[in-house]
């Protein structure tokens, strides 16, 4: 983003916290983006969980505890005074392993979960995939049981705050994440 555009965030920050979601393919990219934007945000969410990212991005990172640890550690080493939230993928055998790696690297909180998948949708009129990327994340009410399972298991495994997301449509859905 351009410096002028980033400065506009300060007006927003007077009214509400701004959390920047960062996406990349290496420690350097995540750290560079964080360094360039740290003065304009209240927290960073490191998105290491997008299921439809091209190879080397998103869940390709978040499925690997070592890569997750290295990226979180790199950003945390460069950005000392801005909280780091790591958004986790549910598409792993043991989400607590990834959560612990992020916590050990210095994450201040975790977001659970990103979309599930990838999945595929076909446009019946054209007989072609709906997404240009062909595959994409599956979201909506049907992922809530998966999100709840991930939050439940992770809550028992780490000592940092959790943001439970995924499949929430009503206040009753949100309340389930609190229990």
Task: Tell me the role of every PLM-derived stretch.
Residues 18-22, 44-46, 84-86, 110-112, ...:
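Hydrophobic faces of well-ordered beta-strands that scaffold small-molecule active sites
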Residues 23-25, 49-51, 87-91, 113-117, ...:
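Active-site beta-loop-alpha junctions enriched in small/polar residues
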Residues 50-54, 77-78, 91, 96-97:
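Outer-membrane beta-barrel porins/channels
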